[in-house]
Swiss-Prot record:
InterPro entries: Ribosome_recyc_fac, Ribosome_recyc_fac_dom, RRF_sf. It comes from Serratia proteamaculans (strain 568). CDD domains: RRF. HAMAP family: RRF. This is Ribosome-recycling factor. The gene is frr.
Length: 185
């Protein structure tokens, strides 16, 4: 029973770290990358649809993304969705394509992005700690029902704490890498 709780906590903590890494991969650095636009949702016939389903996004050069919209009638909606995102991008239409120039990151914008990344990291840490709390609560319930001894309870809590520390270290390492990447000129 305790092993199942530990395995569940391990997999949930791993998912939290992966979600954090996925989230920060969308935060742009100085280079153009189609993944920057992954989180963009476009209003399409009354439904919020991911941009990836409505258009192909390619890198035109190191500072420009090119979006080829499959249905030209929604080009304006795609532009609006990109402008209203918190990425600070200004797309421009060029026939059937939309070009998204990526402005050079100013020192101020880099610092803003680092704040955003740190906030995401804190949310990741909170998610990992919530998993720890859930696991410890399940173990406490087993102790209360007298299914395990106090020694097993203590040992299990120590194991879950070690897992928590390991996953928070992974989060912090990913945070440090992203901060370093953002500060490169």
């Amino acid at each position: 029973m305790i092993n199942e709780i530990r395995k569940d906590a391990d997999s949930r903590m791993e998912k939290s770290v992966e979600a954090f890494k996925n989230q920060i991969s969308k935060i742009r650095t100085g280079r153009a990358s189609p993944s920057i636009l992954d989180g963009i949702m476009v209003e399409y016939y009354g439904a919020s649809t991911p941009l990836r389903q409505l258009a192909s996004v390619t890198v035109e050069d190191s500072r420009t993304l090119k979006i080829n919209v499959f249905d030209r009638s929604i080009s304006a909606a795609v532009e609006k969705a990109i402008m209203s995102s918190d990425l600070g991008l200004n797309p421009s239409s060029a026939g059937s394509d939309i070009r998204v120039p990526l402005p050079a990151l100013t020192e101020e914008r880099r610092k803003d992005l680092i704040k955003i990344v740190r906030n995401e990291a804190e949310q990741g840490r909170v998610a990992v700690r919530n998993v720890r709390r859930d696991a410890n609560d399940k173990v406490k319930a087993l102790l209360k029902d007298k299914e395990i001894s106090e020694d097993e309870d203590r040992r299990s809590q120590d194991d879950v704490q070690k897992l928590t520390d390991a996953y928070i270290k992974l989060l912090d390492a990913a945070l440090a890498d992203k901060e370093k990447e953002l500060m490169e000129f």
